[in-house]
Amino acid sequence: MHIIITRPKEDSLDLINKLINLGHSVTHIPVIKIEKLEIKKVNLENYKAIIFTSSNAIKYMNVEKFNSKIKCFCVGSATERTAKNAGFTNTFSSEGTVDSLIELIIRTHDNKSGKLLYLSSEFISKDLDTDLINAGFSVDRISNYTSFPVEKIDEKTLNFIKKNPPDVFFI
């Protein structure tokens, strides 16, 4: 089976390798590019927990004082694994959606215990911070990365796809 993966390569390497090991042909065609935004250093001591909806937020963290024991709420297991690899030890993972992450935070974290830090993309699909603020939490959202479309696919890849049409797309 020929499978096309459209996520950025660093976010797809595990999946690409698994699919290849299962005997599939995999073509990687990223449709977005991720880039760090310059932000001032964040002092984690000002927060009781951090919220991550993407591994990119962890990858592009710019912290003044790192606290490995700070509570980390992660959108899914891949993001939680990235947080652990970055040195965080107090991690919690939801079921892979922003709604399940909001529910996890509301259910397990005292909204009076202090401020939450939400590191995110410049562009988000859901206002997690607004939902938590409406639930009584104090949240600072800082965008530390952005995304933009990839505008050109190289000719070699296009020719390969024309000769080998894909069976499946992973977006």
Explain the meaning of each model-derived region.
Residues M1-I171:
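Signature of uroporphyrinogen-III synthase
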